[in-house]
């Protein structure tokens, strides 16, 4: 699973996901890509599940680039804990994804293989996505 080696602060505010993605919304490495159409937090487990699905489907052919990184810690309180007494401890990491953001890129394979592999990765994502070709 992806996570930062070290961060400046252990805990973060939740923030808001307004507007569309102005960065990371163009294909820069491969020829085919998966693009987000909705805003969401995508966990490191979901990113890894999508990556595994793509590599398994493409087998030895092609190269895959993961264009998002989970750099936001999500904190959780233990179950059956009373209110108050501070913020919970960091449990997992998420990538903040806005509409238009490229999630995965793929190159070195034919279009039908890429389309099949990327559709498998899309089924692992908690949002609507689209397949795009550069």
Curated annotation (Swiss-Prot):
GO terms for molecular function: rRNA binding; structural constituent of ribosome. It comes from the Eukaryota. One of its GO terms (biological process) is mitochondrial translation. Its main location: plastid. One of its GO terms (cellular component) is chloroplast. Belongs to the universal ribosomal protein uL16 family. This is Large ribosomal subunit protein uL16c. It comes from Atropa belladonna (Belladonna).
